[in-house]
Amino acid sequence: MPLVNPRKNLISICITDRKSDGTIYEKHIDVIRTMEKNNWKIKTHKIWVKGLGINMFRLNYMHIMTFMKKLSKVNLTKEFKPDIFVDDKSTKYENYGYGMSLDVCELLIKEHTAIGDIVYDPFMGSGTTAIASIKNCRNYFGSEIDEKVKKLAENRLSSY
């Protein structure tokens, strides 16, 4: 789930490392290097623990990294923000294997955007970022190239 706020020059990226042939490929390191090479500075790096299920082919955590063009000391809220989220509420929707936690998505939106801001998700998937945006009075738009998944997102969004 990338979360883009163009007015604040802010991008949040949620990415998992991958297991391959019994080893872990740490994709988040490549993301950090690429962003820094393009003059983006990392503001926060958090971990989302997706529950305690064990699967030898998938990892049960994701990296949530927020990058800014210019680092800012101003927080939109004064709440303490934990660096580790433990939330196993991710959901599978109609054979769509990846379900982002709505709770984690809402936390990120509240932390990095203000009411009325625009949230863009270039990999919209099942529409969780859009739903979290609507629930928190943000404007949103998203992109999804898979027509089946796009229809799933449209169906979910129709009840909001």
Predicted segments with their positions:
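Core catalytic lobe of class I
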Residues: 1-143, 148-151
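Short, conserved SAM-binding/catalytic segment
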Residues: 154-160
